[in-house]
Each structure stands twice: as structure tokens, then as C-alpha cells.
Design a protein with these regions (language model features):
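Long, non-catalytic architectural segments outside compact domain cores
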Residues: 1-52, 71-91
Length: 91
């Protein structure tokens, strides 16, 4: 039986990115992991995930949770560096 950690190791996303998807979609981490894995391989998936994280940042700011907003901003920065910066580059 695969654990969450096993599935995370097979996914191209970090746990923070999965957590942001789960927060945005209001689903469990396991569902978010599956969704994120599908999105990251789709044509507009990187952009969709980016927008989810941005939405989460804005929601955290609106409710005054600046520490969480800062954490999500770091998550967004790492996501862009890892996925968007290498988009179109051969592996």
C-alpha cells in the first residue's frame, strides 16, 4: 500500500505546493496531490497552480494571517523557480 509520502515522492510538487492546492480547493492532501499531479502535466496546469497559490496568499492577507501569506509567497516563489523557469527547456 502506498503512503502519502510515497505518492509525494512520485509527484513533481512539494508538500507545500500540495498543501496550497488542498487549501484552495478545500480538499484533503491526498486529493490535492492527485489533482496537482494531473495539473502539472496538463497544458495550463502550471499557470492554474500558480493562480491557486496567489488566491491563497490573497485570502490569507484578507483574514490578517500575514505569516501564512509569507509562507505561501515563498511557496509560490519556489514553484515559479522550479516549474515555470524550466518550462520549455529539455530535461
Amino acid at each position: 500500500m502506498l503512503t502519502f509520502e510515497d505518492c509525494l515522492a512520485l509527484c513533481e510538487l512539494t508538500e507545500d505546493e500540495i498543501d496550497a492546492i488542498a487549501e484552495h480547493e478545500q480538499v484533503s492532501e491526498t486529493v490535492a496531490l492527485e489533482l496537482g499531479s494531473c495539473l502539472i502535466h496538463g497544458p495550463d496546469g502550471q499557470l492554474l497552480i500558480q493562480h491557486m497559490i496567489i488566491d491563497d496568499i490573497q485570502a490569507a492577507r484578507r483574514r490578517g494571517d500575514l505569516a501564512h501569506a509569507a509562507h505561501l509567497k515563498q511557496t509560490l516563489r519556489r514553484f515559479i523557480e522550479e516549474h515555470c523557469a524550466r518550462a520549455g527547456k529539455p530535461d
